[in-house]
Amino acid sequence: MSAQLINGKEVSQKRLQAVAEAVAQRQQDNLHMPCLAVVLVGGDPASAVYVRNKKTACQKCGIKSLSYELPESTSQEELLALVDRLNADSEVDGILVQLPLPKHLDSQAVLERISPDKDVDGFHPYNVGRLAVKMPLMRPCTPKGVMTLLEAYGIDPKGKKAVVVGASNIVGRPQALELLLARATVTVCHSATENLTDEVAGADILVVGVGIPNFVKGEWIKPGAVVIDVGINRLDDGSLCGDVEFETAKERAAMITPVPGGVGPMTIATLMENTLHAASLHDA
């Protein structure tokens, strides 16, 4: 039996439509138009594509977008000065610095310079900390997008065994906090985890984000599990694949996200939701 596909494109379009309707209502109520500032440093082709996708989503939602494309040679001081200006600009609701930054720049210092109420990526330690103490403000986009997908497909994590493979600051750690908030019993696996196959085999809900093509094998997966593949990897032939061996996994899982078309669209939809939320925080 083949798994039901979890369609992130479809769910994300509904969420974007809801944001667009909320933005239109704000205009009727004479509230300011939400505004997202996106900063891109250097010429990384993948980053340029991601930034373009975010601009397109802003247009669909009626969110104003400002774009700052800086040369590879930009210094730490110059980048921090731009963040300071955007923090001080009352018209800007959200600030996004596209990662990865060139190697000579300190990404963590830049992320921590963004005002937490404008941190629409949800990466600032303040926002991760609020999520940890069950008081979320700006929630990291990919983990929150995963939770939205689960909700859309009627999957309640409460009481389930959830296993997160990968412990990055962007996906794995905040994903574990999101699942904990939803009252799942959460295990996080990382490079020092022993018996990874056993951990995966016990998962009712499996979320994988390690950036290694086909890392999790289909035969490891518990029959009837829900599999969320956050990975997106480009192979030598130009095709995209996730971190889970899709063809074998779909024969065991009850539901699974495809790559592409699963989690990716949800990340951008959540970014738009966060920008709208930031605008509402700035209304007062």
Swiss-Prot record:
Belongs to the tetrahydrofolate dehydrogenase/cyclohydrolase family. NADP(+) binds at G166, A167, S168, S191, I232. Its EC number is 1.5.1.5, 3.5.4.9. It comes from Neisseria meningitidis serogroup A / serotype 4A (strain DSM 15465 / Z2491). GO terms for molecular function: methenyltetrahydrofolate cyclohydrolase activity; methylenetetrahydrofolate dehydrogenase (NADP+) activity. Pfam families: THF_DHG_CYH, THF_DHG_CYH_C. Keywords: Amino-acid biosynthesis, Histidine biosynthesis, Hydrolase, Methionine biosynthesis, Multifunctional enzyme, NADP, One-carbon metabolism, Oxidoreductase, Purine biosynthesis. The keyword NADP applies. Homodimer. It catalyses: (6R)-5,10-methylene-5,6,7,8-tetrahydrofolate + NADP(+) = (6R)-5,10-methenyltetrahydrofolate + NADPH; (6R)-5,10-methenyltetrahydrofolate + H2O = (6R)-10-formyltetrahydrofolate + H(+). Catalyzes the oxidation of 5,10-methylenetetrahydrofolate to 5,10-methenyltetrahydrofolate and then the hydrolysis of 5,10-methenyltetrahydrofolate to 10-formyltetrahydrofolate. One of its GO terms (biological process) is tetrahydrofolate interconversion. This is Bifunctional protein FolD. One of its GO terms (cellular component) is cytosol. Pathway: One-carbon metabolism; tetrahydrofolate interconversion.
